[in-house]
Amino acid sequence: QFLKGAEIAYETIINSFAKGDVNSLKPLLTKEMNDNFQSAIKDRRSKNLKSELTFIGIKSSAIEKFEKTTEALFFSVKFVSEIISCKKDKDNNIIEGDPNKIKTVIDRWKFTRKKTSMSPNWYLTEIKSS
């Protein structure tokens, strides 16, 4: 059940970040991660860059690690997904990526939840891409 929710969060976060949809991101991220995402979105906007993304799907996902501290629980998940992405400048010139090429992406995301929380929600706290 956790893994299914993590997959939904993964797709939502990737799509929301590409669109610059800060309202959809906030409930899925820790405060620190939210600050990082907000900063990246502001930076992209200040440079008049547009991110285009088509999420093809998740090829696989697996829990790689479970950790617990006195205060929180952590799940580390490896996602292998396929996306089409590019960045364009204000004149619609492609400056990064390829709008016609499917790319395989491998991400390792860590989710956390406070032990004392009454909420069943998990929050993205760390991202590693390869």
Model-derived regions: residue spans:
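Residue-level marker of positions within ordered structural domains that often coincide
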Residues: 30, 82, 116
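Short, solvent-exposed beta-strand/turn "edge" segments of beta-rich domains on protein surfaces
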Residues: 1-3, 68, 98
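Short beta-strand edge/turn micro-motifs at domain boundaries
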Residues: 72-76, 85-130
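Surface-exposed, charged secondary-structure patches
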Residues: 49-89
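Extended aliphatic helical segments
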Residues: 13, 22, 77-80, 105
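Core segments of small alpha/beta cavity-forming domains
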Residues: 1-64
